[in-house]
């Protein structure tokens, strides 16, 4: 995103992006369950749709808000700012998280309405058990590590594809189905479907996701040191190829063509910073901020 993108516009991008993600996750889950009684087949369809949708949404909304789509991703961005790096301020993080949660609920309700179901009916699928919480810690930690790791080694452009691929895999290799997204988890409690989660299961899942985010940050710091990806709302500047630290661009008051180049480069680089989102299928689909710069 550019340095001139207003917070309201970024919040709108997060709300719409997260809503779109939940429409994909919940809608594909409903469709899959209706078309096949085989849970494995339904999970394949749901995980594929969720991963493809997540990658496209990150690519589309990344230049606007960083496409966090996930409060955990947003919190990692805020933490980077608190520890002397670049990221979102406290007010921005709160606005992002609120927009993501509202979007997730709206997306789940919309998906229910599309299939002629009762919009807003709470899910009845209880997901409890310590093994599921461990699965959420692992899923969320991996998501944050993917985003942080790519951002810190100068490969942020790969985040949309990498996050989508990771979520598709995590849906299968984690016991919880990789919700990995507090906003998405809350939204899915409003859908009594294949991807739903009963309200009483929310506290444990959200707590596990927050813990997983902290673990992911710790692993990124351990593996890559203190190098941080640049913030999505940073001034126009060209990022260093490896560290991801913005380097000032010498002003050029010559032809407009040169000015365009100086402006376009940062926009493309910064779009690759924050994202997210975690989503899952039968058990979850973290969407996350996948994302361009990190946070998230």
Residue spans for each PLM region:
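Membrane-interface helix-loop junctions and terminal tails of multi-pass membrane proteins
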Residues: 1-296
């Amino acid at each position: 995103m550019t340095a001139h993108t207003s917070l309201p516009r970024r919040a709108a991008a997060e709300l719409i992006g997260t809503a779109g993600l939940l429409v994909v996750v919940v809608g594909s889950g409903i469709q899959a369950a209706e078309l096949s009684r085989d849970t494995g087949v339904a999970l394949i369809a749901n995980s594929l749709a969720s991963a493809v949708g997540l990658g496209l949404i990150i690519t589309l909304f990344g230049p606007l808000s960083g496409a966090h789509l996930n409060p955990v991703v947003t919190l990692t961005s805020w933490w980077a700012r608190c520890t002397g790096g670049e990221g979102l301020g406290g007010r921005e993080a709160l606005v992002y998280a609120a927009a993501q949660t509202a979007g997730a609920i709206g997306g789940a309700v919309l998906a229910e309405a599309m299939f002629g179901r009762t919009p807003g009916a709470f899910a009845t699928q209880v997901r409890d058990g310590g093994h599921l919480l461990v699965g959420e810690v692992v899923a969320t930690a991996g998501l944050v590590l993917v985003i942080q790791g790519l951002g810190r080694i100068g490969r942020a452009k790969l985040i949309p594809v990498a996050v989508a691929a990771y979520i598709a895999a995590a849906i299968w290799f984690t016991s919880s189905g990789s919700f990995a997204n507090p906003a998405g988890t809350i939204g899915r409690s409003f859908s009594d479907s294949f991807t739903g989660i009963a309200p009483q299961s929310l506290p444990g899942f959200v707590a596990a996701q927050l813990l997983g985010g902290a673990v992911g940050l710790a692993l990124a710091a351990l593996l890559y040191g203190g190098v941080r990806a640049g913030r999505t709302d940073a001034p126009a500047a060209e990022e260093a190829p490896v560290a991801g630290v913005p380097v000032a661009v010498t002003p050029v008051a010559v032809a407009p063509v040169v000015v365009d180049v100086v402006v376009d480069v940062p926009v493309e680089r910064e779009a690759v910073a924050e994202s997210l989102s975690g989503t899952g299928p039968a058990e979850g689909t973290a969407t996350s901020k996948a994302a361009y710069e990190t946070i998230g």
